Amino acid sequence: MAEESSMEGSEKEEIDSSGGGFGDMASMDSIESRWVIQDDDDSEIGVDDDNDGFDGTGLESDEDEIPEHRLIRTGPRVDSFDVEALEVPGAPRNDYEDLTVGRKVLLAFQTLGVVFGDVGTSPLYTFSVMFSKSPVQEKEDVIGALSLVLYTLLLVPLIKYVLVVLWANDDGEGGTFALYSLISRHAKISLIPNQLRSDTRISSFRLKVPCPELERSLKLKEKLENSLILKKILLVLVLAGTSMVIADGVVTPAMSVMSAVGGLKVGVDVVEQDQVVMISVAFLVILFSLQKYGTSKMGLVVGPALLIWFCSLAGIGIYNLIKYDSSVYRAFNPVHIYYFFKRNSINAWYALGGCILCATGSEALFADLCYFSVRSVQLTFVCLVLPCLMLGYMGQAAYLMENHADASQAFFSSVPGSAFWPVLFIANIAALIASRTMTTATFSCIKQSTALGCFPRLKIIHTSRKFMGQIYIPVLNWFLLAVCLVVVCSISSIDEIGNAYGMAELGVMMTTTILVTLIMLLIWQINIVIVIAFLVVFLGVELVFFSSVIASVGDGSWIILVFAVIMFGIMYIWNYGSKLRYETEVEQKLSMDLMRELGCNLGTIRAPGIGLLYNELVKGVPAIFGHFLTTLPAIHSMVIFVCIKYVPVPVVPQNERFLFRRVCTKSYHLFRCIARYGYKDARKETHQAFEQLLIESLEKFIRREAQERSLESDGNDDSDSEEDFPGSRVVIGPNGSMYSMGVPLLSEYRDLNKPIMEMNTSSDHTNHHPFDTSSDSSVSEAEQSLERELSFIHKAKESGVVYLLGHGDIRARKDSWFIKKLVINYFYTFLRKNCRRGIANLSVPQSHLMQVGMTYMV
């Protein structure tokens, strides 16, 4: 097969721990580039500047027995000191790393309103749900229940999430799909086979450092990449966890708001449960209506409210400890947990379903991390949130020691009479904030899953110009509201909603535990004993809690379980259909024999202009191009196959956005452009801006390609006369500058924008110009060829740019199984017709659009 030229705009180099060691890196400065043999994945279709070595059709001759190894420029070398610091110069950094101290304090203050609302409102209902399953018989029951709550708080939110899981973020991005993305960067586990080796040269893609556990990590990587079953299991696990996150986004508002509004029954005797439901519905409508105003704006508003709430929890707790029974401090002795189970047996086991509610919101700490930094979340939780929560629970326990009958409304009954109405007011505000916390986490998770091909396309609005992670999804917002209202109206019992709440939360927790364990083995490469201890302790505890809530699934929580199954089905069907479609496109791509037969005119008329043909292939000529050739009376003089590809990184730097390749020879004027985006990237550019960036990147690619050819030809000439011209070796720097590799090294440089011909003069200027004067004629021809091609691009651009899109219909083959026909022909087709159209998603103007229909038989 012929080869295809590849040139990447990457400015960084992957640090591969499997080769070389770091001693070689010190040989050059950290900003220098090097030339390496072209990767296998960068070779596919023939290219050449001239006709040398090519047959009459213009494509590479099949008679060449020795493959031609093209040299490509990699990114700059990474200094060993940068490796030790785990930093790469120029690599994208987290949005929050360069903030001032004052800004970090303000950021920590905002975390109260965005991250901790969910876990902060858990005292409203935890004891109420626990004692509904295991009624209080004596004071020791209260001590045992408090001990369970305290150690659950310490074990799950603090140790697991704040101290461990937060560090598994993907460049500041948290959530289930962020963990999956992090694993995908280190092992090819995606079921859609569109990975390229060139993706690993993105500066933010990977940073591997040798360590003693590397061999174990490589073995695990090999197993994951070679086992289709393991890939599917991992995908199912991630989709199940994501569906539980979405379910959590439904049940959290229902639980928090109804618990807060239910306090009216304590203050006003005439208030009934039906009235509580009606007020809760009104509050929920207001809550979801305010969601569009963004996290930054709302964070400044709700931050003070949550601060007052946490201070109220601590104040009420201290008051009750002083007034009632301070002996509840005995609950810090874990032996009371044993006594609690010994006295209450099966009821104590059921009570675990209520106990886990004290840790609800733990996943939001991680999922909402994209809005804030790890340090701000850790600082706020340890210094403010955890102490206030523990004092609040201890205060309720002190009150219940002498008032067993008030266990059904433990929180509001423990509030002093003079402070009841202010606390009720701030509790409702806090409940609304808590609901918003999980909704924002759901938005983040859906955006990640959409970018990674596991959820239908939706309209995403970025609510902040400064921070890309702050988003709002209108369709999902109103969908969550509708389902939430159904839950509130159909399940009016706090106990039943609490059971559903625990089920959704535990589903996400168990998924996170397994994924973080894989990260420990594959990426962190820490001691196996620590990994096993983490998995056994946390997964074991979560399974015990889950066994409690699943036993009560018939009490009404089955609604949330059904909802989660539906969301899982949507995501799996979308991923399955997308995978089949991509595989079909790969199978049906046009062969190089056909391209050779068509010739440079492609068997039709070439009209002036540029055609941007959007497709999903990263290699080969898409089949839809053949449909355009047979359908349209003419095709554009220049065609660029544009592939919008999301890579498993949060952000792709702008200077590494486009990866260009030449398809066939120069006379064909065919190129492939892979526009790479991270799942956190905001695609806000207009079509004019996108066209401008694309054309500029194409020109840079052509210039650098010409320089490669020039360097290769110079290298061949210099092989016979290296002693006469010691300064003839040249590299290209990261900014496009050309460096002479004479003695001393890097003695001088020439700017990329200067014509190549200017660097080749007569022999009396050899000391100032690195090129051999004997190659003046060949360089002149190369320069003229370069200028002609650049002029051709400019004229084509002036003639206009047209977007060529294929409107594909996906159908299952007639010989397919019935289930496959049902899934593809009905479910997947329904999702495609009702998701956001590709035209809107790509910002393609209607006046510059051409579409051709095509049916894919999968």
UniProtKB/Swiss-Prot annotation:
It holds the Pfam family K_trans. It comes from the Eukaryota. Residues 1-104, 169-232, 291-297, 367-380, 435-470, 518, 574-858 are cytoplasmic. Probable potassium transporter. Belongs to the HAK/KUP transporter (TC 2.A.72.3) family. PANTHER family: OSMOTIC STRESS POTASSIUM TRANSPORTER (PTHR30540), POTASSIUM TRANSPORTER 7 (PTHR30540:SF8). This is Potassium transporter 7. It comes from Arabidopsis thaliana. The lineage of its organism: Eukaryota, Viridiplantae, Streptophyta, Embryophyta, Tracheophyta.
